[in-house]
Every structure is written in C-alpha cells, then in structure tokens.
Amino acid sequence: MDLESESSALESVDDNVLIQQSASNVCDDGRSLDNGSCSDESVKLLSTSNSVELGKPMSFDSPGDGGGAYSPVLKGQGLRKWRRIRRDLVKDTSANMENSKALKRGLSGVAHSHGKQMQFQSPEVEQESQGSVGSVNMLKSSGDGFDILGSSGYDSRFVAGVGFSAGMDLEIDDDRSSKSSTVARAPKVIRYEKPMISSGQGGNIRVENSKKHRGESVDFEKENSYSSLESDSRKQSGRMMDYNGENGETSMRKDDAGGEGGESINTDNRYSDEMDPLTEAINGFLALQDALEKEVQQFQEIGNEPMPQHHEQVSEANSPHPEIVTLVNNVEQLENMLEETRSMLEVKESHIRDLESTTNQSKHSWGGTEIVVEDIFRQKIEAEIEYLIYSRSIDNLNSQMKLIDEQESLAEEQTHETLNKLGRVQTKAANFTNRAQDLQNDCIEITGTIKKRACKITSYVLIQLVLLSTVVLLLLSQLLPEPDTVVPT
C-alpha cells in the first residue's frame, strides 16, 4: 500500500513536470528541484493530494528556504527521472503533526491567481470531511489578492466560521459516537477528477487533469476523511480534559471577521458538574480555532511564496463557479449554525449568572444561619454531654439501689431466721419453765412424803426404845437378888 501510494505520487509529479516542460520549454530562473525535495508547497500538495499515506506524518519545508520557481534538472539530452531520497521524519513536533493532518484531511488541488498557485479540494471530499477541523480547506487572504480559483477572495471570516461550525458538527458527531453519521448527513456530489487550475497573464483559466489516477485514491480519500474525524475527536477530548483545570475558568474567543471581542465565561469549581456540557463545547471551539489559525498561517506562508509560471498554457476546463456557490452556501449554513450556538451559549451564560447570583444570595443568607446552627449544635453537644452524665449517674444509682435491695432482702431473710430462732428459743424456755415447775412440785411432794416417813420412823424408834428399856429392866430385876433388910418407907 505504501509503495503504491509513493509510486503514484511520483508518477503524478512526473506527469506535471512533463506538461510544464512541454508548455514552457525554458525555465524561468534556472532553479532546479533538489533530489525530490521541493521548496514549493503547491507541488508537494499536488503530489500527495490523491495518495497521501494514512498515519504517516509529512513535514512542510520552510517557505523561505528555496526560490519560488523550479525546473527539472537537465542531464545531457532529455529529462532526468525523479529519484526519491528518504527523509528523516520528525514525529514529535506539533507542526509536522498538524501539517500531516492537514494533508490527510484532503488538500487536493492548487489554484493560481495573480502569480500565486493554490490547491482546491473536490466537493465530495469537501462534503464528507466537514466533521473535522481541516475539512473545509480555504486560505485566508492577506491583502495581496490571494483568491480562490482566481475570483471571489474569501477573508478570514469564512475560515473562522467554517472552523467553528465544523467544531459544532464534531461535537454532534462525538455525542452520537458514530463516524458514519457525518458521512450520511453530508450531501453527495458527483465525483470528478481533481484539476490543477492556473491563471495566465491574459486572465485565461486553464486546467490540466492529471493523467494517472489510480483506483486506490478514492479509497484513500474516504479513509482519510474517517481517520481525520477520529483523530480530531481524540484530540478534542484530550484537550477538553487538559484545558484550564487549575482555576476553573474558560474563555471563548470570537472569530476574526465577526469583529466581536473575546468573551470569557468564569465558572466555579463547585458547579463543574452542571457546567460540563458548556465547558466541553467551549473547549472544543477553542481547540478547533487554534488548529484552524495554525493551518491558515501555514496557507498564508504558502501563498506568499513566489510561484512559477509553468502552467500558463494548459488545456482549458470548465470553471468551478457552481462548486464555489455550493461552498459559499455551506459556509452560510455553517455560519447560521454558529449563530445558533452563540445564542445557546448566551442563554447558558445568563443561566450561569442567575445561578451565581442565587448562590451569592444564599451565601449571605447562610451567614446568619450558620451562627444559629453553630449555637444549636453547641447546645446539642451540651445536652448530649449532660445526658451522658445523667445516664451514667442513673446507672450508678440503679446499681446502688440493686445492691441495697439485695442487702434488704438478705436482712429480711436474716430477721426471719432470727425470729424463727427466737420462737424456737421461746418454746424451749416455756418447756424448761414447765419442767421446772413440775420438778418443784415433785420436790415438794417428795419432801412431804419424807417428812411423814421420818415422823413415823422416829415414833417407831421411840416406841421400840421404850419397850426395850422395859424389857431390860424386867430382866435385871429378875436376875438380881432381893435385899434382906427392909428399908423403911
């Protein structure tokens, strides 16, 4: 694929050089192409218009390095074939990336007006690639008559308007998440071969179609439109995330030809959730405008270079005024869309101002309520502390009451036990008293009986002694003899 695209590019450039040689036969200032590296931007755009390689960055040479004219190098008799020398590609610079994107977005033809040559894109590619930044490839006029196709010089107003409208279209396409929706919405125009248009000294417009157009160029252009749409959407999403995230402020700059000053929208970080759609739209506009301004500056540098007059005597072709009319209509439609978006942004700005005013009022009203809330919060904390203290004291008292109740229950049990013991002792004492009385009664009875027995015994003993004495006396009297003398009585 790469070899075919490079060979087709070299063959198209060879054909153009042969046509130029046959038309002029003599070079203007004798300057030659230096091993395929030409300082003329139009020749490079022409050679890479139909077969630009996808994903491969291409670098523009500086406008002032070489002269404005060129001529093929003569070697002996005839022309020398172009010999391509591989260049050192710089992939990291932003200028090369943007230039490659500009080429991939469909820079197609070179138009020449008042000694200057430019490139013009076919209407189908123009319509298909409206979703990207470089879809509408126009050159900003710098006051020296740099016109499109030799007539109706467009100023930077159309370019800026187209850039902003393309940004809106890209926003819609990103929301729908469909690449094919942009192609489906774009009007289709019958495809024709890309001409190289030049104007002679007499004002005649002559066109020469390139001879060798390969069938793969159509596929390349369609893939370029799709890849440009995807790359722009990725680039836009990346810039929207990185844009001015520190202070939360976004600014929207108006286009150059509108004459309106820059307007800025200051958003607060607290309302970032509500402002996401608006900030995304504004960031997309700013990113698209920056990319478009860079492309316009590059086109101005290309247009300010002196161009050779090698294409003065080529065959005529039909004038592309209908295409210009369609482009103007498209630009007007895009400007209308831009006005609508501006009105929507103004409405959103008014809504943001209303929200800010309401927030400021709420802040002032919150100033007094905060003190009340703080007092209530302080009272709440004090009440909670008191509640904790009381709850703890109540818990302690409850525990003490439980202990006292337990002690009372124990005391009651002890009193019951003691009362029971006392009852038992009293019953025992009563029993003992009864026994004592019984014993006393028994003792009295025993003593009475003993006394009676003692009296009886003593009476018996006395009686027995008396009897004994009488008996003894009787015995003695019998034993003893009776005396002889008589005692006188």
UniProtKB/Swiss-Prot annotation:
Residues 215-224 have a biased composition (Basic and acidic residues). GO terms for biological process: nucleus organization. Keywords: Coiled coil, Membrane, Nucleus, Transmembrane, Transmembrane helix. The chain crosses the membrane at residues 460-480. A motif (Nuclear localization signal 2) lies at residues 83-84. Residues 49-73, 195-264 are annotated as: Disordered. A motif (Nuclear localization signal 3) lies at residues 104-105. Expressed in seedlings, roots, stems, leaves, and flowers. GO terms for molecular function: protein heterodimerization activity; protein homodimerization activity. Signal peptide: none annotated. It is a single-pass membrane protein. GO terms for cellular component: cell plate; nuclear envelope; nuclear membrane. Its main location: nucleus. Residues 323-446 form a coiled coil. It comes from the Eukaryota. A motif (Nuclear localization signal 1) lies at residues 80-81. It is found in: Nucleus envelope; Nucleus membrane. Residues 459-489 form the KASH domain. The KASH domain, which contains a transmembrane domain, mediates the nuclear envelope targeting and is involved in the binding to the SUN proteins. Mediates and enhances the nuclear envelope docking of RANGAP proteins mediated by WIT1 and WIT2 in the undifferentiated cells of root tips. As component of the SUN-WIP-WIT2-KAKU1 complex, mediates the transfer of cytoplasmic forces to the nuclear envelope (NE), leading to nuclear shape changes. Homodimer and heterodimer with WIP2. Component of Ran complexes at least composed of WIT1 or WIT2, RANGAP1 or RANGAP2, and WIP1 or WIP2 or WIP3. Interacts with RANGAP1, RANGAP2, WPP1/MAF1, and WPP2/MAF2. Interacts with SUN1 and SUN2. Interacts with KIN1. Core component of the LINC complex which is composed of inner nuclear membrane SUN domain-containing proteins coupled to outer nuclear membrane WIP and WIT proteins. The LINC complex also involves nucleoskeletal proteins CRWN/LINC and possibly KAKU4 and the cytoskeletal myosin KAKU1. Interacts with WIT1 and SUN2. Interacts with WIT2. This is WPP domain-interacting protein 1. It comes from Arabidopsis thaliana (Mouse-ear cress).
